[in-house]
């Protein structure tokens, strides 16, 4: 048996664990009689029982042991819970530490506070059942499983003094995101970063099935962890005293290994990738709960997952619950007033050393603004609209290079992407930093190193999870990805947006840096990769979330992209989605005009318009390729109908299309009508799926006259122009749409339609013969 714990300390830690377990069960079951000062009655029990018991005792056990480690070694540590359905445990521990009452003074540290604590859990207008933003010390709700370890590593990057204890549920370990997250240790630099201590909580069962990792041999499991690059330390048992001693010894060993790895790297330099420790904790699911209910085994089975005892119409169940609660001996844990006994409370760390009060778990408290160069200095010089071509993301890459350079000292900015930084033309950043890499490096490798700040791994899950963990602990970042494949993290985006929305209502949660997406290699320039790479639907997905959280930008050129990116990097508590092309495209606005345009969100391009306030048609566009096609259509219309009056409206901030009552960026009705008129036809060329524009504008006065072209799920490996043709977004179709909708041109519709189909036939014959677009497309340029 380990001599890490004296018998007295072990007894006190066991009592602390009992207290956390008691509070956890009380939250799930009780609405009254919190100290069992009366015999338990049916009216003391909640009418609806919600919560998850099975994982909770293991989480509570680990919490008290980590507290011992923090106190004895003066550690800076946070606690990430993969199985976040163990929410009552984390609420219980933050209450025992006092931080819960500090955040919520009504939840006093006495009998009344206990009753409120119990009653509010999973109660209408109370607190959620998981480790939600309302829980002090949480940066990871753990409702949707799979992201704990990625968040933990994200939190550890650039936090050299921080240790992140990450509890990985054995059910969670079956998810794809978690399975690849073990590889994060190939990106953690012990000289510069903090440490992650993964603890695999092997309690054996999910909701109704065994877990895979619990049903393979110990040798196979430890070999798996060693294959991932960890040194596993196994703790197992179902006798509390033995487990207390074994777990204390395991944690001491793990800490010693972490400190030795860091000391070697920080004094001798990084010479090789270390083998970091991890712990496998095998204890029964629902440990310390009822052994059996109605003759069926509960503890150590899947039946312990949620609410082990239900149906309290049976008086025997009330008695069984009381026996369970009294097994924790609450009279030994709380005084007559319901206060946690001082000799037990003294086991917890104090102040910011408490995991539930650590400022890293409320990252806005630590957030420092980025040092940003003046983005105007990176502008594409332009003598007139359409006078030059440029790669928008390459211009952005030069700007990001200097953002990276100017924040090297503060170490609070990283760029994330799934092996696409160079492909997306952002490789300018590699002039000032490497791609982070702790695995082997060969002669053919370029810009890999242990001190890099560009995070590339071919897992969108890891990129997203790392970035979220980095942001939630008070830093800044940007995630660059191919547009079609960002859908891989649709659900992760959901969870982060929900987190931000919840935080808006929690006064003590300080704002964090926004999560910034740059989607490029987009649908209209994936002609070379084909249909699988063509999907602009992430825009729709983002727009579903709360208007207080989401922003969507479609800059039409490089200078607008620079303005938008600067704005997004300065923003707080949003998810900013930027969609921009990487291929050479015509540039439209000089930097001053771009700033004005982006500030407005949408505007009339007077240099492309000739309506004198009374247009025949409004040609609207959002997105770089739709903008090109719209302007080309304008030229065609002027050729076809010399006296036509056209207004060109470009939208860069998609959310301005909504009314101001629906989104803070929304245009009021008067301003919207000034742009789009109240009664004239609007032909809207949109980057994404066309129905989104209808959805955003359906309450507008002129909605009936808005006709939208966009992606309609047609694509292949073809030419760039054929992509827009396949989806009826090409200039010829847009021009025909305008003619069909202008009443005074009704007599030209038939001839215009014939001309359109003749052009389409010529286009198809040409690309079939030459494998490239027609010269009039390739060589087109704007002429006023």
UniProtKB/Swiss-Prot annotation:
Cofactor(s), by name: thiamine diphosphate
Keywords from the named record: Lyase, Thiamine pyrophosphate
Signal peptide: none
Pfam family, one: XFP_N
Coiled-coil ranges (or none): none
Keyword Lyase set for record: yes
Name of the top EC class for this enzyme: lyase
GO biological process terms on file: carbohydrate metabolic process
InterPro entries hit by this protein: Phosphoketolase, THDP-binding, Transketo_C/PFOR_II, Xul5P/Fru6P_PKetolase, Xul5P/Fru6P_PKetolase_C, Xul5P/Fru6P_PKetolase_CS, Xul5P/Fru6P_PKetolase_N, Xul5P/Fru6P_PKetolase_ThDP_BS
Membership in a protein family: Belongs to the XFP family.
Protein known as: Probable phosphoketolase
Biological source species: Rhodopseudomonas palustris (strain HaA2)
């Amino acid at each position: 048996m380990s001599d890490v714990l004296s018998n007295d300390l072990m007894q006190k830690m066991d009592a602390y664990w009992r207290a956390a377990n008691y509070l956890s069960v009380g939250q799930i079951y009780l609405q009254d009689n919190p100290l069992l000062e009366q015999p338990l009655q049916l009216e003391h029990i909640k009418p609806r029982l919600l919560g998850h018991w099975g994982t909770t005792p293991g989480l509570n056990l680990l919490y008290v042991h980590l507290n011992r480690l923090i106190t004895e070694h003066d550690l800076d540590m946070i606690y990430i819970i993969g199985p976040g359905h163990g929410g009552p445990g984390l609420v219980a521990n933050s209450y025992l530490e006092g931080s819960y009452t500090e955040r919520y003074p009504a939840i006093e540290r006495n009998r009344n506070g206990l009753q409120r604590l119990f009653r509010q859990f999973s109660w209408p207008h109370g607190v959620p059942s998981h480790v939600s933003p309302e829980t002090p010390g949480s940066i990871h709700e753990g409702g949707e499983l799979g992201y704990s370890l990625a968040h933990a590593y994200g939190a550890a990057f650039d936090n050299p003094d921080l240790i992140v204890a990450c509890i990985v549920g054995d059910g969670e370990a079956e998810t794809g995101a978690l399975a690849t997250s073990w590889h994060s240790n190939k990106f953690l630099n012990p000289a510069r970063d903090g440490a992650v201590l993964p603890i695999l909580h092997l309690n054996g069962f999910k909701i109704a099935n065994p877990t895979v990792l619990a049903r393979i041999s110990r040798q196979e499991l430890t070999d798996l962890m060693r294959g991932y690059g960890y040194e596993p330390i196994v703790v197992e048992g179902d006798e509390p005293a033995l487990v207390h001693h074994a777990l204390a010894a395991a944690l001491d060993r793990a800490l010693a290994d972490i400190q030795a790895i860091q000391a070697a790297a920080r004094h001798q330099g990084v010479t090789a990738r270390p083998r970091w420790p991890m712990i496998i904790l095998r204890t029964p699911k629902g440990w310390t709960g009822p052994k059996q209910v109605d003759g069926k085994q509960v503890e150590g089975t899947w039946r312990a997952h949620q609410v082990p005892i239900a149906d309290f119409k049976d008086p025997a169940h009330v008695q069984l619950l009381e026996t369970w609660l009294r097994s924790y001996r609450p009279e030994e844990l709380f005084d007559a007033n319901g206060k946690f006994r001082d000799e037990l409370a003294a086991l917890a760390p104090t102040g910011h050393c408490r995991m539930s009060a650590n400022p890293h778990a409320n990252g806005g408290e630590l957030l420092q603004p980025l040092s940003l160069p003046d983005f105007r200095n990176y502008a594409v010089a332009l003598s007139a609209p359409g006078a030059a071509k440029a790669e928008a993301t390459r211009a952005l890459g030069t700007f990001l290079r200097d953002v990276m350079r100017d924040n090297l000292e503060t170490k609070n900015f990283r760029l994330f992407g799934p092996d696409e930084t160079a492909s997306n033309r952002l490789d300018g950043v590699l002039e000032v930093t490497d791609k982070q890499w702790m695995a082997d490096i060969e002669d053919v490798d370029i810009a890999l190193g242990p001190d890099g700040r560009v995070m590339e791994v071919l897992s969108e899950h890891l990129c997203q999870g790392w970035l979220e963990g980095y942001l939630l602990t008070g830093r800044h970042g940007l995630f660059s990805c191919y547009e079609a494949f960002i859908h891989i993290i649709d659900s992760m985006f959901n969870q982060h947006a929900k987190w931000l929305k919840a935080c808006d209502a929690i006064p003590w949660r300080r704002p964090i840096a926004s999560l910034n997406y740059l989607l490029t290699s987009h649908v209209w320039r994936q002609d070379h990769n084909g249909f699988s790479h063509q999907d602009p639907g992430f825009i729709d997905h983002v727009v579903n979330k709360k208007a207080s959280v989401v922003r969507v930008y479609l800059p039409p050129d490089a200078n607008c992209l620079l303005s938008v990116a600067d704005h997004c990097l300065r923003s707080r508590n949003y998810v900013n989605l930027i969609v921009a092309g990487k291929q050479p495209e015509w540039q439209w606005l000089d930097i001053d005009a771009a700033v004005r345009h982006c500030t407005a969100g949408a505007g009339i391009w007077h240099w492309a318009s000739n309506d004198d306030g009374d247009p025949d048609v409004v040609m609207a566009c959002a997105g770089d390729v739709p903008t090109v096609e719209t302007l080309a259509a304008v030229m065609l219309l002027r050729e076809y109908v010399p006296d036509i009056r056209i207004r060109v409206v470009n939208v860069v901030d998609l959310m301005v299309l909504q009314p101001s009552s629906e989104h803070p960026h929304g245009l009021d009705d008067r301003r919207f009508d000034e742009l789009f008129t109240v009664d004239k036809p609007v032909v809207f060329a949109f980057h994404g799926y066309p129905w989104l524009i209808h959805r955003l504008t359906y309450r507008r006065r002129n909605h009936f006259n808005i006709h939208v072209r966009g992606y309609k799920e047609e694509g292949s490996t073809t030419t760039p122009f054929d992509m827009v043709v396949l989806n009826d977004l090409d200039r010829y179709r847009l021009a025909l749409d305008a003619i069909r909708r202008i009443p005074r041109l009704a007599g030209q519709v038939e001839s215009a339609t014939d001309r359109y189909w003749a052009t389409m036939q010529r286009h198809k014959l040409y690309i079939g013969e030459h494998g490239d677009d027609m010269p009039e497309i390739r060589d087109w340029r704007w002429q006023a």
